[in-house]
């Protein structure tokens, strides 16, 4: 049906979807020059001394570089867990979890963390960093005096802060696995989308030495749960996972409040895929001056995205649903154990695409922030354990969530930036496995390709859509609820209105939105509430209907 051979010229070429709403995003405390170049540079001949997180010279011994994952099991190092100074019970848990050799990230970070040092680790997702910070935390708790059962408010010893519910749930599950032979140590999970009263009861009646949380819900407990602030005064280790993502989602103020509520004499671990200025500023606030910076992403190392076969397709909006259907059916026919993630721009568009693909009789699940947490947990678990399934997702699945053996990632519409493209793509090609990625753009979204021109992405020829496919997709679209189309249109309008390239020209934006409306099979663009249009700065723009 579809021929995705390379075009002749290229044949030689190798809505914000958040969980817990942040309480605010403050202006940068220092300079606003982005990037990492002033933090730590890769060593070179005759290079100047490394610059520390505080901008002061440090010895080269203070920075650890390590290799990154390659093909097969090369993401594993030769170092075994039983060579590390872990207690016998923890080692039994590691072995029961099926771990024998450390990943490169674990090899680089574990010995330093076990010494009690504050550590900022630059580490990519899918490299074993969760185990790298959990094992030392478990060791700290295991060496503390036993909890007095009669104590009304026993201290919480470890706090792990994750940007999304899925990541928090994953970290808590990993902790429970590693704690198999530490029955007296308990892990509790506090995340948005669940009843606070239930969490309060669990923390009161069950052991809670390790608390895994999303920032918004943790702040809620600090403010509303009796005795919770007192329990936090016993914290020995604070872990900020996916720190750059936490800040991208606007949780800076919440993080500052959390840090202020904890004792100063503690160990702080911060893991981040990138280390921009915002992350460095959090280090100033949360970490000791003699912190260790461990860089596990060497200059020139093979990135996850370089292992993934990448293509982009440029097509008008009215052809994109048919192209998506063809891409998926072709992939399914070629891969008996297919496992696909389709990323969409907003939660409402995600819902619409999932409904359409379901009408087309594909095996589809959807996941986004508008779904209840219990549903999201169930779907995430099902997709993780299944084959022969398509997950239509907003960006709740873009980072950190480890879905094994994903064979294809499709991105519909322009990502917000280069980093988002890479993190979405990183759901496939993990741990040395192969994978494919396809970016589906409209002609007016081609500008984005300039930001990823250094990546090994090639242009696929525009596939021909046969009449049968076109009719099948149009029929399925006709069965999609009109209300869902209206909500998707409004969300689409909001997403592209906030895009600095497309949203600048409001008249052109409305024209494109109405093109999207027609691609949904609507004769007239849906009416949008006047208040919403006013907030978008789109009132009185010709072509829009208000209500």
Swiss-Prot record:
Q: Where is the composition biased (Basic and acidic residues)?
A: 53-70
Q: Where is this motif: Q motif?
A: 79-107
Where is there biased composition of kind Acidic residues?
Answer: 1-34
Residues recorded as binding ATP, renumbered to this chain, are 123-130
Motif DEAD box is found at 241-244
Task: State which Enzyme Commission number(s) the record gives.
Answer: 3.6.4.13
The record's keywords, sorted A to Z, are:
ATP-binding, Helicase, Hydrolase, Nucleotide-binding, RNA-binding
Disordered: annotated span: 1-74
Alphabetized PROSITE patterns for the sequence = DEAD_ATP_HELICASE (PS00039), HELICASE_ATP_BIND_1 (PS51192), HELICASE_CTER (PS51194), Q_MOTIF (PS51195)
Superkingdom classification of source:
Eukaryota
Q: Where is the Helicase C-terminal domain?
A: 327-478
InterPro entries per the record?
A: DEAD/DEAH_box_helicase_dom, Helicase_ATP-bd, Helicase_C-like, P-loop_NTPase, RNA-helicase_DEAD-box_CS, RNA_helicase_DEAD_Q_motif
Instruction: Give the comment on domains.
Output: The Q motif is unique to and characteristic of the DEAD box family of RNA helicases and controls ATP binding and hydrolysis.
Name of the protein: DEAD-box ATP-dependent RNA helicase 31
């Amino acid at each position: 049906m579809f021929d995705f051979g390379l075009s002749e010229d290229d044949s030689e070429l190798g809505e914000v979807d958040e969980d817990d709403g942040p309480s605010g995003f403050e202006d940068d405390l220092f300079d606003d020059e982005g990037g990492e170049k002033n933090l730590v540079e890769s060593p070179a001949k005759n290079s100047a001394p490394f610059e520390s997180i505080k901008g002061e010279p440090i010895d080269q011994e203070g920075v650890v570089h390590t290799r990154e994952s390659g093909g097969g099991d090369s993401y594993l190092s030769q170092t075994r867990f039983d060579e590390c100074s872990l207690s016998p019970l923890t080692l039994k848990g590691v072995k029961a979890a099926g771990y024998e050799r450390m990943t490169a990230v674990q090899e680089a970070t574990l010995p330093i963390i076990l010494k009690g040092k504050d550590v900022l680790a630059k580490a990519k997702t899918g490299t074993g960093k969760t185990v790298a910070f959990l094992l030392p935390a478990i060791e700290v708790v295991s060496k503390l005096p036993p909890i007095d059962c009669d104590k009304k408010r026993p201290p919480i010893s470890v706090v792990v802060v994750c940007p999304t519910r899925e990541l928090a749930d994953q970290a808590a599950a990993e902790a429970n696995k590693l704690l198999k032979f530490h029955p007296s140590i308990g892990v509790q999970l506090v995340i948005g989308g669940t009843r606070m009263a239930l969490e309060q009861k669990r923390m009161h009646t069950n052991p809670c030495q390790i608390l895994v949380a999303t920032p918004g819900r943790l702040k809620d407990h600090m403010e509303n749960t009796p005795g919770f602030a007192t329990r936090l005064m016993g914290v020995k280790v604070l872990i900020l996972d996916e720190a750059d993502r936490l800040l991208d989602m606007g949780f800076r103020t919440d993080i500052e409040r959390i840090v202020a509520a904890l004792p100063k004499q503690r160990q702080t671990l911060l893991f981040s895929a990138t280390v921009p200025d915002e992350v460095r500023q959090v280090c100033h606030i949360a970490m000791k001056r003699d912190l260790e910076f461990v860089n596990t992403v060497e200059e020139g190392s093979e990135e996850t995205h370089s292992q993934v076969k990448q293509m982009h397709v440029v097509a008008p909006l009215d052809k994109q649903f048919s192209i998506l259907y063809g891409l998926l059916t072709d992939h399914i026919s070629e891969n008996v154990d297919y496992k696909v993630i389709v990323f969409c721009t907003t939660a409402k568009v995600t819902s619409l695409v999932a409904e359409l693909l379901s009408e087309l009789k594909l095996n589809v699940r959807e996941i986004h922030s508008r779904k209840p947490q219990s549903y999201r947990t169930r779907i995430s678990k099902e997709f993780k354990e299944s084959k022969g399934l398509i997950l239509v997702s907003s960006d709740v699945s873009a980072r950190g969530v480890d879905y094994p053996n994903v064979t294809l990632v499709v991105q519909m519409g322009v990502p917000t930036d280069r980093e988002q493209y890479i993190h979405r793509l990183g759901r496939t090609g993990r741990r040395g496995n192969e994978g494919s990625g396809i970016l589906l753009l409209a002609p007016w979204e081609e500008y984005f390709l300039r930001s990823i021109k250094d990546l090994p992405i090639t242009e696929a020829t525009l596939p021909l859509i046969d009449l049968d496919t076109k009719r099948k997709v149009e029929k399925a679209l006709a069965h999609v609820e009109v209300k869902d189309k209206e909500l998707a249109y409004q969300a689409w309008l909001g997403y592209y209105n906030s895009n600095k390239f497309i949203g600048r020209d409001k008249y052109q934006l409305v024209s494109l939105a109405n093109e999207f409306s027609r691609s949904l099979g609507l004769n007239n663009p849906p009416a949008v509430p006047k208040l919403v249009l006013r907030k978008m700065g789109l009132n009185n723009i010709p072509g829009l209907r208000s209500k």
